[in-house]
């Protein structure tokens, strides 16, 4: 299949709003042009309202508005809220801790995330080596691949996902393939696969993990604080590891 194998037909949905506006404009024009024909224009107006109403209901039903309202009504609703996703109140603690611990500002070190979307760290002003992007150099992809190569070797799913696509330039673990957000539910990495030498060569200083890493010392990671960073109602608990020098 080549390049077609990575093509996602659902991306067509990105231009669907434009198509709906074109249909709306055409429909309004049709009603205006035939406003003298009461029956025809009335039927068209009814059809237009029906389509717009159904579309609006579908958007509301499947949008983030619904999940956020559900989350406000029931904190146990199994979808991430805005504060959950961005780890509000948690990564603020991490930032303050590293400032006190190292005396360095955020631009002086680089971080990666495990089990938490890198966007959360980026949102809090951290300088990230990982992220979700469809526009970064092939050279960087190859360099980052060295960091996660041990995990890719253990999971064909992860290997194909990164090598054949690669927009998610994330840390992966074969113990939980396909899970990019790990809730504080007792899960921990028993044997994380990670090349910390390659991570250090890439400039990585700290790793934020939403799960405890049992083999951290073996990997060359130093847990900076035994107690994880969290709040009473946070989705994540974050362990901060320092990447050892080569």
Give the label of every model feature segment.
Residues 20, 33, 212:
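Residue-level marker of positions within ordered structural domains that often coincide
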Residues 29-64:
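Signature aromatic-anchored transmembrane alpha helix within multi-pass, membrane-resident enzymes
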Residues 60-246:
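Extracytoplasmic
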